[in-house]
């Protein structure tokens, strides 16, 4: 009966408010798991010698959520022991040092959760329709994700 109360769950969220590492990691904690692995992608203050002021993210929300759910399904097929998965991505303005994406995965042992987190971030960058604009001191640039399949279809 207790196992049912801790059935595997996926927590997907796109939000414009500041992301909380504590909140996201708490979502995946389970008494059945000895590992919680995290990836936190933050805004850095420079890119190729240019000073970054902040980032701005936009998404095709419904498709992004669908793709994020698909990533969770794929993780569960590849690593059946994974318990809970949380993928939270920020939209709008993300200041320097703040998180733009937090991924948390719990599993009984570390190998599965570490591998699953790596798969999640790599697949998210390659398949989820979220776009990043870097704002510099005197210009801005929409960033093409080299891993993104639709951006590279003509190459």
From Swiss-Prot:
Catalytic activity from the UniProt record: 2 [molybdopterin-synthase sulfur-carrier protein]-C-terminal-Gly-aminoethanethioate + cyclic pyranopterin phosphate + H2O = molybdopterin + 2 [molybdopterin-synthase sulfur-carrier protein]-C-terminal Gly-Gly + 2 H(+)
EC class: transferase
Disulfide bonds: none
InterPro entries (alphabetical): MoaE_sf (IPR036563), MOCS2B_euk (IPR028888), Mopterin_biosynth_MoaE (IPR003448)
Miscellaneous note of the record: This protein is produced by a bicistronic gene which also produces the large subunit (MOCS2A).
Pathway(s) the chain acts in: Cofactor biosynthesis; molybdopterin biosynthesis
Domain of life: Eukaryota
Protein name: Molybdopterin synthase catalytic subunit
One GO MF term attached to the UniProt entry: molybdopterin synthase activity
Protein function: Catalytic subunit of the molybdopterin synthase complex, a complex that catalyzes the conversion of precursor Z into molybdopterin. Acts by mediating the incorporation of 2 sulfur atoms from thiocarboxylated MOCS2A into precursor Z to generate a dithiolene group.
Pfam families attached to this UniProt entry: MoaE
GO cellular component: cytosol; molybdopterin synthase complex
Subunit record text: Heterotetramer; composed of 2 small (MOCS2A) and 2 large (MOCS2B) subunits.
Assigned EC number: 2.8.1.12
Binding site for substrate: 109-110, 125, 132-134
Keywords recorded for this protein, A-Z: Cytoplasm, Molybdenum cofactor biosynthesis, Transferase
Organism in which the protein naturally occurs: Taeniopygia guttata
Gene Ontology biological process terms in this record: Mo-molybdopterin cofactor biosynthetic process
Family recorded in the similarity comment: Belongs to the MoaE family. MOCS2B subfamily.
HAMAP family for the chain: MOC2B (MF_03052)
């Amino acid at each position: 009966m207790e196992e049912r109360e801790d059935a595997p769950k996926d927590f997907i969220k796109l939000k414009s408010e500041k992301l909380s590492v504590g909140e996201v990691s708490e979502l995946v904690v389970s008494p059945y798991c000895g590992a919680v692995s995290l990836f936190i992608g933050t805004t850095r203050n420079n890119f190729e010698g240019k000073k970054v002021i902040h980032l701005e993210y936009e998404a095709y929300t419904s498709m992004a959520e669908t793709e994020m759910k698909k990533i969770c399904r794929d993780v569960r097929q590849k690593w059946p022991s994974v318990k809970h998965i949380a993928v939270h991505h920020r939209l709008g303005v993300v200041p320097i040092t703040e998180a733009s994406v937090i991924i948390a995965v719990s599993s009984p042992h570390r190998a599965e959760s570490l591998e699953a987190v790596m798969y999640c971030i790599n697949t998210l960058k390659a398949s989820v329709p979220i776009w990043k604009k870097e704002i510099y001191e005197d210009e801005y640039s929409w960033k093409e994700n080299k891993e993104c399949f639709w951006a590279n279809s003509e190459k």
